[in-house]
Amino acid sequence: MLPRKREIVAGEVEDLQKKTRAGEGEVTREEGDAAMAGRGNEIDEDLHSRQLAVYGRETMKRLFGSNVLVSGLQGLGAEIAKNLVLAGVKSVTLHDDGNVELWDLSSNFFLSENDVGQNRAQACVQKLQELNNAVLVSALTGDLTKEHLSKFQAVVFTDISLDKAIEFDDYCHSQQPPIAFIKSEVRGLFGSVFCDFGPEFTVLDVDGEEPHTGIVASISNDNPALVSCVDDERLEFQDGDLVVFSEVHGMTELNDGKPRKVKNARPYSFFLEEDTSSFGAYVRGGIVTQVKPPKVIKFKPLKEAMSEPGEFLMSDFSKFERPPLLHLAFQALDKFRTELSRFPVAGSTDDVQRVIEYAISINDTLGDRKLEEIDKKLLHHFASGSRAVLNPMAAMFGGIVGQEVVKACSGKFHPLYQFFYFDSVESLPVDPLEPGDLKPKNSRYDAQISVFGSKLQNKLEEAKIFMVGSGALGCEFLKNLALMGISCSQNGNLTLTDDDVIEKSNLSRQFLFRDWNIGQPKSTVAATAAMVINPKLHVEALQNRASPETENVFNDAFWENLDAVVNALDNVTARMYIDSRCVYFQKPLLESGTLGAKCNTQMVIPHLTENYGASRDPPEKQAPMCTVHSFPHNIDHCLTWARSEFEGLLEKTPTEVNAFLSNPTTYISAARTAGDAQARDQLERVIECLDRDKCETFQDSITWARLKFEDYFSNRVKQLTFTFPEDSMTSSGAPFWSAPKRFPRPVEFSSSDQSQLSFILAAAILRAETFGIPIPEWAKTPNKLAAEAVDKVIVPDFQPKQGVKIVTHEKATSLSSASVDDAAVIEELIAKLEEVSKTLPSGFHMNPIQFEKDDDTNFHMDVIAGFANMRARNYSIPEVDKLKAKFIAGRIIPAIATSTAMATGLVCLELYKALAGGHKVEDYRNTFANLAIPLFSIAEPVPPKTIKHQELSWTVWDRWTVTGNITLRELLEWLKEKGLNAYSISCGTSLLYNSMFPRHKERLDRKVVDVAREVAKMEVPSYRRHLDVVVACEDDDDNDVDIPLVSVYFR
């Protein structure tokens, strides 16, 4: 990650790191403050854009001022620290009084065999610091005292006795202000979290969602008042929500800013707990907006919460009775460790029995809360594997706890209240494990072997995995797989592919990359970093996009050799393609995705679960073209329009110019052939660029930008309101300018308005770039010289035109109207274009500008934000800053490290099952989680849909095969034997046979493969022995029957 103010901070940080590595103990808060003084609270928006989209500036600033202690640097502590350093807190102090063991290499990716024997905390400092030089990372060794804790806003303990935890928590709880205390443990396949943020903790934003809004259509004078909204979009209000009103005409009493309560919320209306019978009558207009009040949470201290835990946060409702038992189990383990000063030995019957006895003993003291039954088998698994910190569990809980620290330091999102327990005991092999299988082998995988046994470990090491994508998810997966030993034997292989390169904005989450990797391929850099984590990892990094075009690379032999596929993708199209290949080759697919604090995982297991493509989210609703171009009513509409205009003016039109200049004859011929309104518009834009609007000096670019301002934000609005005055009525007699339409007003230009001047300068700079005109320094910031240059431009007076057609129909797909004279106009334009082109200097060309959102120095977002905000000003829509504009126009997907880490941890818990084999669908889990609320919803996957016909049944996972170089007739007869009447056979997008076409009957006695070669132009590669055809069938009652893909093995 790139540092902020590196020149100020780096030297002091390095000195402090030397101090901690020399074993001189902690860095004091004063030293840390001095070293970080140069950092300030400025935010590198290029670097943190995806995280800013989740947290916002205020939360980020609070994080920048937070000092955090992480105690216990086994895998869980390392994961928490990693997520906090990436998030950008002020400082992270690592504490551990133990030394690195080979055992730790199963879960802590900062450690290597060379670190064995060193203090764990000190061994992690340097590599953690590399992730973000703007965060001060230091180590504290030796005994921890309560006085140490006073230096922090939040403290996290991952390996501490219950007695000590209660002592520290009491201290933290009693401080003013309280210090947030978090205790979390990962013990084998079991984990726990406890949070105490003090007697009264204020949550500033409970869910992180944008406040819901609605456009008012009517309000009754009643008690309670009925508020109806336009049916453009469903309302998201819930009973009990508080809302405020603005812009209401008539019933102006509601515009007082007072929050009012919603009740009986419906999709397009709700009642307001307000007597409006004496208010003015509603006339028109109005925006209703949700108010999100702060929430105060009262936490119990740990000592009290242990005996009165209240409701546990649930995750898997098939394990409804599990949390109270695990609450007991962790206490029993603590007692075992306190009395014997060690963990139970894996597979030791005596040790397991002792933990069970402790659990029974503690249970007997619980009175009304005593459990009626204790699952001894579950406690056996818990105790036996309790010494192990497994990487997937550490990754999952590292995400959860990292997010809780962010909540504690910022007040953003609802804290976990107060206990959370989780287990993945289903990840254990189906066959019982013998004690001998669990014995350590003096290996870096010993912790994992102590839980799963050496047989499964061998399977993991020999696995052949295909991982698609090496971005945020991919980096986490690679780290996890390397620590788990996946593909780490001579027979194992991990193929990684990603066609993307590293950008600056990646560095805040994609922790395998550094600033010096910017511009390099993601896959090769990530693979190299993963091999540093585990040098035995057999990984092959490719830069091919997995798609139909690369099936020569990822061919049949490649797919058939795989054991599992892991998706680390960020788009649905690629996911659907990989899903189709996994179904075709019957390979397990482990799917996951994130959106801000939310994440989901889906297991796609051959013959057991439905595939990814079986259920899809509905497409995002698109605003009608007429709304975006003439009747916007929110900032999203303005930004959609702004980006469209940016691309039209600065990318598409210069590209059209170059297309004409590179081959005038072909270009003109294509325009004549098209002969439509679109071709006419393109020719007009090209001529404008080369004639009337051609720029030769920077002042010409200023003139162009100023006149565009007048055209867009004054003249067009004047024309629109001339065509549709404010009192216009529709053909049905309703007011034309009724909700959601907003009546616009022109913006009058003033060079003293900084936002207007900035927009014109940015637009002029980009216009100049398209013509290759040098940019003067004075033009890069609003100043007196710039204002004078803009004021020089002579702006003609506008005269509205009669008979102008403006698209108002919501289903219109084009703003260009066809005309019977298009062909004649095109001929005139072509003649004009040929004439203009003769005046151009030799070699003239334009430089199209492709929108790039992640470079704040290129003026792209200045233009788009300026476009959108001037448009918003026309329509009295609230304006946004450049950062918010970037999120919307740049279609930035909000992303943080914590949800990504959690998702990959959950997936890797499923990977144990997929590679072990033999598991039933009931053993697998899909997850949806929202760390903001927090919500964890874990459930069994849905089985695939079964289709039945006579005695046959099949699912999406089945493929029918026919052996032999058969004819079409023989294929029809083969299906007839199954009681199916085939009426259509296709290959790819081509129809090989249809019973309705007489000529197709001539093909019946030809080989299927020969017809495919002739009709579908299908060349079957030499490595493939079969051809796939899609057959449409009916049963004897003429009902369509969906049958599987049919593979004809002709070789």
From Swiss-Prot:
Transmembrane segments: none annotated. GO terms for cellular component: cytoplasm; nucleus. CDD domains: Ube1_repeat1, Ube1_repeat2. Pathway: Protein modification; protein ubiquitination. One of its GO terms (biological process) is DNA damage response. Disulfide bonds: none annotated. The N-terminus is blocked. One of its GO terms (molecular function) is ATP binding. Residues 56-605 are annotated as: 2 approximate repeats. PANTHER family: SUMO-ACTIVATING ENZYME SUBUNIT 1, UBIQUITIN-ACTIVATING ENZYME E1. Monomer. This is Ubiquitin-activating enzyme E1 1.
